[in-house]
Amino acid sequence: MKILITGGGTCEPIDSVRYITNFSTGRTAAFLADFFCAKKHEVTALMAENAQKPKNAKIITYRTFSDLQKILESECKIANYGAIIHAAAVSDYSVQEISVDGKIFPAGTISKIPSGKNIFLKMQENPKLLQKIKLWSGKQTKVVAFKLTSGATEEEQQNAVKKIFLAEKDFAPDFVVQNDKSEITATSHPCKIYKNSDKIIAETKTLQELAEALDGALWGAPIEGVGRNEVRP
């Protein structure tokens, strides 16, 4: 089966040396890519330039939101993927223009803003790529979305997942992987996998368990293991 996995974080340029980004390392996406390669799937990893890369997958890199959007649309339309795992940390906003001491410049057009200047950034909202994936690839493609919260209560986590399923409507993902930044450590990566807004099909503690659970969920196999074999209302 052909699988596309996105990972890492977008970089939105301010000038030639400054940009806005996030803390995503691409570690989860790289791990999943190598896991599915070992399962003999044909994996393409669409990764941020500075992200951790998988060892065995075909790699395509992106830098900005615009890069990711163009490449993702093209891959979805031409490559006939059976599954798309969208783990990239996509910026909600891009820099539209910069005001330097009252003078306006389009984002990314200044070589380097001198220090000591008063700078104001005008941001523009980026479209939600998750809403486009099934539109581009077809509803037959299995789509896995990721939702990271930070210091959220259980109710807040559930509401964040519910918002994804409701917002996408006819093009909703098949599964949402939810985790909370406050619970992630060097050795532990707790996740919940939702099949719809109120049904948890797996709870995992490590990336290995997450990969195995997604493998079972995507291909319809039973999900075995402690904490990963029950469907809760």
Language model feature labels by segment:
Residues 1-222, 233:
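A cross-family phosphate/adenosyl-ligand binding-site feature
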